[in-house]
Amino acid sequence: MSDSAQSIKVLGELFEKLSVATAENREATATEIASFLNGNIIEHDVPEEFFKNLTKAVKDKKTAAAALETIAHIANENNLSPSVEPYIVDLVPEVCVKTGDKDKDVQSIASETLLAIVKAIDPVAIKVILPHLTKSLVTTNKWQEKVSVLAAISALVDAAKTQVALRMPELIPVLSEAMWDTKKEVKHAATATMTKATETVDNKDIERFIPELIQCIADPSQVSETVHLLGATTFVAEVTPATLSIMVPLLNRGLAERETSIKRKAAVIIDNMCKLVEDPQVVAPFLEKLLPGLKNNFATIADPEAREVTLRGLKTLRRVGNVSDDDTLPEVSHAGDIVTTRGVLDELTKDTPIAPRFAPVVNYIAAIAADLIDERIIDQQAWFTHVTPYMTVFFHEKQSKEIIDDFRKRAVDNIPVGPNFDDEEDEGEDLCNCEFSLAYGAKILLNKTQLRLKRARRYGLCGPNGAGKSTLMRAIANGQVDGFPTQDECRTVYVEHDIDGTQADTSVLDFVFQGDVGTREVITEKLREFGFSDEMIAMPIMSLSGGWKMKLALARAVLKNADILLLDEPTNHLDTVNVAWLVNYLNTCGITSIIVSHDSGFLDNVCQYIIHYEGLKLRKYKGNLSEFVKKCPTAKSYYELGASDLEFKFPEPGFLEGVKTKQKAIVKVSNMSFQYPGTSKPQIADINFQCSLSSRIAVIGPNGAGKSTLINVLTGELLPTTGEVYTHENCRIAYIKQHAFAHIENHLDKTPSEYIQWRFQTGEDRETMDRANRQINESDAESMNKIFKIDGTPRRIAGIHSRRKFKNTYEYECSFLLGENIGMKSERWVPMMSVDNAWLPRGELIESHSKMVAEVDMKEALASGQFRPLTRKEIEEHCAMLGLEAELVSHSRIRGLSGGQKVKLVLAACTWQRPHLIVLDEPTNYLDRDSLGALSKALKAFEGGVIIITHSAEFTKDLTEEVWAVKDGIMTPSGHNWVSGQGSGPRLEKKEDEGDKFDAMGNKIATGNKKKKLSSAELRKKKKERMKKKKELGDAYVSSDDEF
């Protein structure tokens, strides 16, 4: 098109014709103008003068209808010229005004014209037209104009859904205001447009709640109920500006509600949703709305747990939004602003100035570029497709493309970017290359992350407890990861921690054969390669130690000809010899492996890549664990236990009567041996040791040597076949088994708080009631028939009821059965009255009634004020000492906890009664590196004794001083400092003021201060004062305790 004399003349004639056109012939004139403007005429020019005249015509009452109809025809042309489109959009404000005109005919034509323009424009030019529409909606007082504009916005959603989604943060407030309009027609139209606009919210988590969210905007009284509904939602989908724009109004109101429960749930939703935000710029526009509410609630909410939840949401919002420590809000990126892109374009074309008449086209190009930046479309071809038609209005195509490419590069440079990850891949066959999200229960674990695996590579999977490492492995094995190859395409085998308990009596050979992995001959040969003897192959699985069970599971996996081995803590229970064997096998077998392990040495020796959980993504690092730590120093705790910032703390053990130093033995074993029934020789023999409050003992030895058996006898799980085991009367032992989950596996549907309440509700530890040293067996029953001669009468003990101090030991109150006609057929034993109870010394009772004595000792220890109230607050505080958040303790079921979180729960439950001795069987199983470091430091600081069975020299090297080496059932101690009697060292004092004390039912025990002993002079003075009062008051005198 050209403003040459000829073109000006033609357009002038057409415009004159339009000015005088009647209603019957104006359509024909409009069509003729539209065809001329969009036709093949001279290039590199625009119809500037014509559109100036057309704008005047729209404003003129006489020509408005004809001008509007002309605009509609131009917009409706099949091929709208790029030199015309920007000028058509510039007419939108005038068209909007005419939709509210008094003339109904003009109103109708204007509404149709506005819809035609909206449908005609390039969707990526939304940044030009939408501000015109929203400004009209906010500023006009004419309800007809508002209704027409709302209809145009609805049409815009259909025409440019993706682009409208990015504009939702600025659109929702405008539509919300229209929903509160006093005019019924506007309210209905605004609600319909809001419903239409929310179709751009592509979020499966909240789409079913969108009607309620819209209702909340119209009726704020629905906020509480809607927050409750959303509070139970699992958020797994990526959170976009459109999602936040519809959610933030609700959350903002939820934070301001009066009920603490609503404030808490709003904080939980903010925390969960913000974790799914990919780009800080997505949340940036909403920070000023959400941060003040969270900060205010954290400062004012009285409930500590709700305040903690609020703080967690606040921390997540600050982290995701890149908010500084002083709460200075980050600057919102202006990379996608029209002003910014226009500035870049002006800078590029300053040497080839563009004529002023092209200003609308230049602005249009800047708007298109701004939208492409917002959509993060940086592909060269996409920019050519969208921008070239408009750039060629004033430049030739070749020059246009050169400018566009430079324009793209400079505009893209303004986009805020996260860390630039180098490609850590190398050449090789891809086994898997997929993108997926993963959730467990109500928790999002991974969001739109990529996983790429090569054949014959070994990958270490690292991340904190609860990140979802085992969940990801299990999801892969169960075919629940989107895009991961099926078992037919790629055979994947998951090697779990433990073999199913229902297989306990199955022989090793039969167990492997059940997996349909080959003939018995092939299986037997493979098991021999793995070190199994013929005798072991025929043994039941229950007879294998933990290490051999793990080796069996590995052998079974290998026999399945796996392409990918999923190894979850493969070194658990393995001794150093078998770990070395496993390292060699994995390095030479040529099978792709994904390994979860907290053994840093093992990962160093095996892994070629580390896959690390970072912000709901998996990031791959080339090299082993030590190389990974160099690239990611924040993960230093994976390599050095002491580098962990996490802190655990064990409760201080109570005072033990008669124990005046930390060296005095509280457990002593002499000449002890143990043999399982039906076996040919003792599992352990000739064992001698002692433990004190200062003990730091590492129990080491190969698999099957008898380590766990030794500890089971020490803790009372098993009774010794021969020998003596002495335990201090009030000593409490916390024992965490090798299979730590055995403690909780029957309580998976309880919360951790409910489990601890169940376990200690009677005042005793219900998990220990079935220990062998508390069960009365036949031998015990026989020895309890011992006859005592008391006051000349033969008696048997019926019960032992209480205890009191007697010299340097204790004596116990016993009730009796009286013997009549002993040794005769008519022998009988008659219960005696309680007045006949007698006190017998411990030495006399222990030989025949040791277990009954132990029961009384335990009850006395609990009654002495060592019990803790089973309140939610007390349980949450105790669990927090071992790294479990209140949210998990009181609001999550055990079933939903990760392996590491379950171990922390077991640690918390076992130490609830403030033990004097902590016994840990393979504590490195399941705990992540941070937690292991925290556990190590907590055990060092613990005031009681510690015994650890482990194959991890790294864990015990700086922790233990004494070593019990167990081999072939013989225990050889070294580094011990056993003493007879109290030994040397600082004297232990009983702390009188240890805070509030509670009995076994949780009732507070009132403890008065000891009265000071008065001197003789003070006693005489008191006596004189009493006598004086008595003389003065006579019979009215009543003495008080204070007078003595």
UniProtKB/Swiss-Prot annotation:
Which stretches make up the ABC transporter domain? 426-641, 667-993
| Superkingdom of the organism of origin | Eukaryota
Its cellular-component GO annotations read: cytoplasmic stress granule; cytosolic ribosome
Task: State where ADP binds.
Answer: I42, H44, S83, T392, H396, E397, N703, E922, N925, H951
Bias (Basic residues) occurs at: 1009-1031
Which keywords describe this protein according to UniProt?
Answer: ATP-binding, Cytoplasm, Elongation factor, Hydrolase, Nucleotide-binding, Protein biosynthesis, Repeat, RNA-binding
Pfam families, alphabetically?
4HB (PF17947), ABC_tran (PF00005), HEAT_EF3_GNC1 (PF24984), HEAT_EF3_N (PF24987)
Q: Which Gene3D superfamilies match?
A: 1.20.1390.20, 2.40.50.990, Leucine-rich Repeat Variant, P-loop containing nucleotide triphosphate hydrolases
The intrachain disulfides are none
- Sequence similarity: Belongs to the ABC transporter superfamily. ABCF family. EF3 subfamily.
Function as written in the Swiss-Prot or TrEMBL entry: Ribosome-dependent ATPase that functions in cytoplasmic translation elongation. Required for the ATP-dependent release of deacylated tRNA from the ribosomal E-site during protein biosynthesis. Stimulates the eEF1A-dependent binding of aminoacyl-tRNA to the ribosomal A-site, which has reduced affinity for tRNA as long as the E-site is occupied. Assists translation termination by stimulating the release of nascent protein from the ribosome by release factors.
What name goes with this protein?
Elongation factor 3
Source species of the chain: Eremothecium gossypii (strain ATCC 10895 / CBS 109.51 / FGSC 9923 / NRRL Y-1056) (Yeast)
